[in-house]
Structure formats: structure tokens, C-alpha cells
Curated annotation (Swiss-Prot):
Protein name, entry field: Phosphoribosylformylglycinamidine cyclo-ligase
Biological processes, Gene Ontology terms: 'de novo' IMP biosynthetic process; adenine biosynthetic process
Protein EC: 6.3.3.1
GO function term, MF aspect, one: phosphoribosylformylglycinamidine cyclo-ligase activity
Family matches, as NCBIfam families: purM
A single Gene Ontology CC term: cytosol
Pathway membership: Purine metabolism; IMP biosynthesis via de novo pathway; 5-amino-1-(5-phospho-D-ribosyl)imidazole from N(2)-formyl-N(1)-(5-phospho-D-ribosyl)glycinamide: step 2/2
Catalytic activity: 2-formamido-N(1)-(5-O-phospho-beta-D-ribosyl)acetamidine + ATP = 5-amino-1-(5-phospho-beta-D-ribosyl)imidazole + ADP + phosphate + H(+)
Main location: cytoplasm
Keywords on record: ATP-binding, Cytoplasm, Ligase, Nucleotide-binding, Purine biosynthesis
Length: 346
């Protein structure tokens, strides 16, 4: 009996690292010290910072992985993994500095996992972020053969006096909603349940444009890094930012609001993405559950002063992101921090 017989092929693992080396190193910026394969990844703090603050974020892709693996779509979930982390980090005004990944599988499937890494590298390039390292764990008997799980970790950097944490949000500020690519990476346990009820396959079409359903559901999460960087470079006074993930607008938007203030949303200001209408109809999902599970077409939000709305919308449009003024900041009645959100079905 040896390790390979027990289900772990160390030689294949080494070959896999060599296979992915070039696409990983393409993400490396000048601050990276050394290459892939060491025990730790090393990176310099970029020049020009006087009082840098490091901002960290970690996340996964959830059960979207189940659907992706079912249909053999591995590249996109690599992008998803990066997006879920970097979109969190930028809400504090930080720019992503480096990314780490963790891949656990039942047995090493080099072709599928190489696609995942290529997707992660592509997401890092979109985010101007170095893929500094990672871990690939082969765990036979723990994960089924051919299955894998992903986790990501990102660190960003921002000047202390440029840190955005929501404390500057004021009554009367406006809320800018930036369009999502669809479902992104949250709510897929409900999505998969609906799919099993609706008896769909890889050829199922939906909506007035007859789009492929599975392809739409697996569309990678939008990465908002470059857009936020452009907004900050224009010195737009952003008082708060939120990444709309699990729990939708009702769960995520109030998280950054100071005590005594609430977001008041007008849901008629944007057109709900068709995929959510299909899910609601196919699964007979109550409207309240729809809003409390999915992003409903809004993937990221900015809170800005009223007189900066047009500037914010113009910058979004110039960078090919649809955006709308979807609401405003109002005073709450009970002065509690997490007292919810107004204007959304509850």
C-alpha cells in the first residue's frame, strides 16, 4: 500500500503546479518577490503610501459549484471566486493587492482544475491583483471523486485617510445601484431546487430573447474593481459602498449605515433582470423570498451626496456599467443600526 493507492497522487500534484505556473505568474506585478512554489508568497507594500491600511476579505462560490461541475463549466467559477473577495475589499476604498486560493478535491482532475486556476488568474487580471499563491488539497474519501470546493482570500490596501466605512453617510444622500451580471454567486441552493422542479437541461431557453438558461445562471460575477478605481480617481466623494451578495439588498445595504439612518429604495427605478422573473415563476417563489435571496439585478451600490449623482452615473456609463439612482438615505424611527430597509417587499 502506498499514498497513490490510497487516492493521493503526489507526482500528479507536482505536474499540476508546473502546468498552472505560467498563467499564475502572468498576474504578478512588480511588488511580487519570487515565484510560485515556495512555502509563502512575498509581496512588497507599493510605493507612495504614507499610512497604509490593509483590508482583507475571504469567500467562496457556494453551491454554484455544483451546477458548474454538473455542466463542465470550470473557468467561470474561478472568476466568481476572485469577484466575491475583491468586490468586498473595494467597499472600503482599497485596491486589491494580492489573492490566494484554496482548492479541495476528491481526486485531482488536472483539466478541470487548470480551467479553474485560469479563471482565477483572469479574475485577478481584471482586478489588477497578483495571484500570490494557493493550495490544492487532494482529499479522497472526504470529497466525492471529480468534485471540488473553492475558497479565496484577498488583501487590499488603502491610505488611512481614504478609508471608506460608512461613517460619513448622511440623511439625504443618494443610493446608486450598479447592474449585476445576473445571479452572481448567491442563492444557488434555491436555484438548484427550482431547476430540479422545472426539469431543465443544457438546451433550455428563457425570456423574450430566448437566452440559454444554464449559461445565464453560470455567468461569472461582475468585478467592480476597475469601476470603483475610476470613481475614486475622479475624487467622487463616496460615503459608502456595498457588495450585494447573499441576502440581497435588504441584508447587505443596511450593514454600513450609521445608527439612525436607513436606505429607502424605489424598486421601479431599474428593470429586474429576466432571470429572476424566470426563477420566481418556475419555482413559485414568494416575492419577499426573492428579494431576501437574490441581488435582483443590482450587484454593487454607492452612497453619494445628492449633488454628485449625475457625476457618478456618468462615470459608470463611460466605463460600460449600467447604473441607476435607486433610492436615498432617510432617518429611521427606532434609531437602531440594522433596522432594515424601506421600499422593498417585506
Amino acid at each position: 500500500m502506498d499514498y497513490k493507492t490510497a487516492g493521493v497522487d503526489v507526482t500528479a500534484g507536482r505536474a499540476f503546479v508546473e502546468r498552472i505556473k505560467s498563467c499564475v505568474e502572468k498576474t504578478h506585478k512588480s511588488e511580487v518577490i519570487g515565484g510560485l512554489g515556495g512555502f509563502g508568497g512575498c509581496i512588497r507594500i507599493p510605493k507612495g503610501f504614507e499610512s497604509p491600511v490593509l483590508v482583507s476579505g475571504t469567500d467562496g462560490v457556494g453551491t454554484k459549484l455544483e451546477l458548474a461541475q454538473q455542466y463542465g463549466c470550470h473557468f467561470g467559477v474561478g472568476i466568481d471566486l476572485v469577484a466575491m473577495c475583491v468586490n468586498d475589499v473595494i467597499t472600503n476604498g482599497a485596491r486589491p493587492l494580492f489573492f490566494l486560493d484554496y482548492i479541495a478535491s476528491g481526486t485531482l482532475t488536472p483539466d478541470a482544475l487548470a480551467e479553474v486556476i485560469e479563471g482565477i488568474a483572469a479574475g485577478c487580471c481584471q482586478s489588477d491583483c497578483s495571484l500570490l499563491g494557493g493550495e490544492t488539497a487532494e482529499m479522497p474519501g472526504f470529497y466525492p471523486s471529480g468534485r471540488y470546493d473553492l475558497a479565496g482570500f484577498c488583501v487590499g490596501i488603502v491610505e488611512n485617510h481614504h478609508l471608506i466605512d460608512g461613517t460619513k453617510i448622511n440623511c439625504g444622500d443618494q443610493i446608486i445601484g450598479i447592474k449585476s451580471n445576473g445571479v452572481h454567486s448567491n442563492g444557488f441552493s434555491l436555484v438548484r431546487k427550482v431547476l430540479s422542479m422545472a426539469n431543465v437541461d443544457e438546451n433550455t431557453l428563457y425570456g423574450k430573447d430566448k437566452r440559454n438558461l444554464i449559461q445565464s445562471l453560470l455567468e461569472p460575477t461582475a468585478i467592480y474593481v476597475q469601476l470603483v478605481e475610476k470613481l475614486l480617481r475622479e475624487n467622487l466623494p463616496i460615503h459608502g459602498m456595498t457588495h450585494i451578495t447573499g441576502g440581497g439588498l435588504p441584508e447587505n445595504l443596511p450593514r454600513i449605515f450609521p445608527s439612525g439612518l436607513l436606505p429607502h429604495i424605489d424598486i421601479t427605478t431599474w428593470e429586474i433582470t429576466e432571470i429572476f422573473n424566470w426563477l420566481q415563476n418556475a419555482g413559485d417563489i414568494p416575492e419577499i423570498d426573492l428579494w431576501n435571496t437574490f441581488n435582483m439585478g443590482i450587484g454593487f451600490c454607492l452612497i453619494v451626496p445628492k449633488n454628485e449623482v449625475n457625476s457618478a452615473l456618468e462615470i459608470c456609463m463611460k466605463n460600460d456599467f449600467e447604473a441607476w439612482n435607486i433610492g436615498q438615505v432617510v432617518e429611521s424611527q427606532n434609531n437602531s443600526k440594522h433596522s432594515g430597509i424601506l421600499g422593498i417587499p417585506s
